[in-house]
């Protein structure tokens, strides 16, 4: 393609290139005045020009950046909408009432400090309750109005008024309607045979009136006392007393675990609630009935007794009934002797829980003669298919074998009061209607694991502060800065405990949840296995009537007290750690001040003997430690003269050596800076020190006492070089020389008694160390540099030589003792060898006597 551009004038004065192109290169909707191929859809077909390309690239980048900005805006709006939607869903879910949750509730404990032998406790909820420590409460909603005294059992455990939820027990057999008729039990013959008679007007037998009840078309008939049932209409329809009258509430426990509405349970001993029976004020009474399984009437008083031959005895009675089919369940009769039990409102009927090794029985007892003898009968609705949960667990027995009376008198109080509960056993689903609290609740510190972490960090901070304070002995001006920094570190550590606690709380709640899940699944599996083994006589959708007594080998998943021990131990550690932290924080400033005072050195001297037992391994606080200390003190006292003499020699020698060194250094420095006359004077001085009086110098050298620079001979006779100085005259001494020679001597000798200040050499021997705001470390450093005398560091030298002498003396005593032992052994061996030698010599002489001349007789 060939393009030729013609530039021509256009009317109006505008010069525009005119382009001629081939047919293939022509673009749509172009004009003759446009130098570019123009397209409305794509405006990027430019002329062949470098500047045009750059402009095109810039436009593309700007469009992309604008597009990105638009994309970020869209993403932000999308996230905002997503967050709003999520928050709305969460808000809706938080406020959504969750009905009929099955919570993990422990059954089978007691009220703290009372004879109430059964109660419920929150065991495994997430995460508002803590097992065995943070107990929840329950309450009833029945008002009691009497003119008597207070209801002390309720008032003793008053905590707070909370929300109320109605319990659900309509699924239980104990809340079903029964068809009952009144009967009389007549025992006229002496064979303990009791006849059942249908009558209209009933009389008491064994202290109670009786009913025959069934709900299975005579397949199963139950003979029960009339006190356990309540008639609801005129058609002989009865229900167990207390059904649908108990209101209960689980406090502060989000029941958010759902294992099914109807789990299979083997045997449940329910908690007891005080409820007021409906009736007039004169007949109102307090009954005990659980929220999930109603055991009928547990009357005003409840005693707990140990089942034995002395307390209660079984009466063997034969119940005879005419013409019946199916199962006829008769009660068990007891004659009991109870002491210290008083009924409420002076009524004759009391309720007694009798526990034995393998089972628990609920008795209704009647006392007609105001004595200690009671006629008792086992409650039919107090036993679930003869399967029981033993009341006192083997490791959690009731404190007292029997309990005294309950003060059950009532005044104008209400039962809207909560009770504090104690540890319980077992896990039982409790169906309630509640609003699920699905959020985490900030509760009290659980285990205090964060306190352990904070203790480690705080201990590190305290150790660091102690180290920095010790270093600050030589830097007094930095102590306040170090102290402030240490306080900042410790405050940050203590403030960080809350953040760590939040993490620990979530972890702890997860552990509790997992533990509760595992326990429930294990118990459920064991229950199902037990059902498969023993079978069921009668089974509903909730309960299985087995016909077997409770066995101690069943349901022992929660017998271990390891969890309780862990919780109590962690609580103790938590309190101890917090106490230690506060004590360390309060004493930190005082410890810093102590480190910065000379008292620390004095305290080290006081504590020196207390550390000797630690220096010698294995001594401890035994008597050997005191023996060793006595020997060390004895050796130190006996060796003190020699030690002092040796130390005096060492220090005096070091002082003389230092004085000689300083003297030579002093004169050498001044002689190098003065004129020839000063050099000559220095040579004369050296000649007087080293050359003159050779014999006396040798005497000083080999003298027994070390030369200290001030011997009597030196002071008595002036040296020849002194006279030589005087002969020259003072006219040759310059003012500068006078100042340099006389001034040091005067300044040094002004501390020496009896000195005139005219002998600079004598003063140089007694140079006094002056500390200018330094300490022993600066002194030693200056001594190493040669600017101070060595005696500055004499104390470590004394200590070293003293320890060497003590160790040497101990070693000498040891070696001498060893030599004495060897000498005694050698003497003993020599004595033994001498005795053996003499014995052998004696025996040898006896066996080999000396030759004797024997004359034979001669015959003539």
UniProtKB/Swiss-Prot annotation:
Residue intervals annotated with topology Cytoplasmic = 636-860
What Gene Ontology molecular function terms does this protein carry?
A: structural molecule activity
Q: Which GO CC annotations does the UniProt entry carry?
A: host cell plasma membrane; membrane; viral envelope; virion membrane
Keywords for the protein's UniProt record, in alphabetical order? Cleavage on pair of basic residues, Coiled coil, Disulfide bond, Glycoprotein, Host cell membrane, Host membrane, Host-virus interaction, Membrane, Transmembrane, Transmembrane helix, Viral attachment to host cell, Viral envelope protein, Virion, Virus entry into host cell
Stretches of the chain forming a coiled coil according to its record: 577-625, 664-700
Q: Which GO terms describe its biological process?
A: symbiont entry into host cell; virion attachment to host cell
* Disordered: annotated segments: 746-765
Which Pfam families does this UniProt record tie to the protein?
Answer: EIAV_GP90, GP41
Annotated segments matching region Immunosuppression: 499-514
Extracellular compartment ranges equal 7-614
Q: For this protein, what post-translational modification is recorded in UniProt?
A: Specific enzymatic cleavages in vivo yield mature proteins. Envelope glycoproteins are synthesized as an inactive precursor that is N-glycosylated and processed likely by host cell furin or by a furin-like protease in the Golgi to yield the mature SU and TM proteins. The cleavage site between SU and TM requires the minimal sequence [KR]-X-[KR]-R.
Segments passing through the bilayer: 615-635
Where are the stretches annotated Fusion peptide? Answer: 447-467
Pro-sequence positions in this chain?
A: 1-6
Q: Which residues are glycosylated?
A: 40, 112, 141, 148, 186, 201, 214, 235, 244, 308, 337, 340, 346, 369, 400, 407, 412, 423, 484, 491, 551, 558
Superkingdom, natural source: Viruses
Residues of the site described as Cleavage = 445-446, 685-686
Q: What does this protein do?
A: The surface protein (SU) attaches the virus to the host cell by binding to its receptor. This interaction triggers the refolding of the transmembrane protein (TM) and is thought to activate its fusogenic potential by unmasking its fusion peptide. Fusion occurs at the host cell plasma membrane.
- Which proteins does it associate with, and in what oligomeric form? The mature envelope protein (Env) consists of a trimer of SU-TM heterodimers attached by noncovalent interactions or by a labile interchain disulfide bond.
Task: State the name under which the record lists this protein.
Answer: Envelope glycoprotein
